Amino acid sequence: MSARKKNRIHVFFVSIMIIISLVSGFGEGIKQINYKDLIKDTIPGCTSKNPKECVKVPANTYHRGCEISTRCHREQHSSSG
């Protein structure tokens, strides 16, 4: 390859990289999270004076599903002694 052809290829790729960076918004700056936004994510009533309010209730409690060994039937406990 001649030096002139290599130079054109380099200019082409540099031009493409500049265009891509302008279109993608590279260098616009990153928004920072401030402390006020972090305060909004707290549980209402959860303070150092009232720590019992800070406990979260699980959304879905665990329950055991169907088991192959019991053929999906629940065991009945007999009260005969």
UniProtKB/Swiss-Prot annotation:
Span of the signal peptide: 1-29
Gene Ontology molecular function, alphabetical: hormone activity
Keyword list, A-Z: Disulfide bond, Hormone, Secreted, Signal
Membrane-crossing residue ranges in chain numbering: none
Subcellular location: Secreted
Gene Ontology process terms (BP): calcium-mediated signaling; cell-cell signaling; regulation of growth
One Pfam family this sequence matches: RALF
Disulfide bonds: C46-C54, C66-C72
A GO CC term attached to the entry: apoplast
Keyword Signal: yes
Keyword Plastid: no
Function: Cell signaling peptide that may regulate plant stress, growth, and development. Mediates a rapid alkalinization of extracellular space by mediating a transient increase in the cytoplasmic Ca(2+) concentration leading to a calcium-dependent signaling events through a cell surface receptor and a concomitant activation of some intracellular mitogen-activated protein kinases.
PANTHER family: PROTEIN RALF-LIKE 15-RELATED, PROTEIN RALF-LIKE 16-RELATED
Family: Belongs to the plant rapid alkalinization factor (RALF) family.
Protein's UniProt name: Protein RALF-like 7
Higher taxonomy: Eukaryota, Viridiplantae, Streptophyta, Embryophyta, Tracheophyta
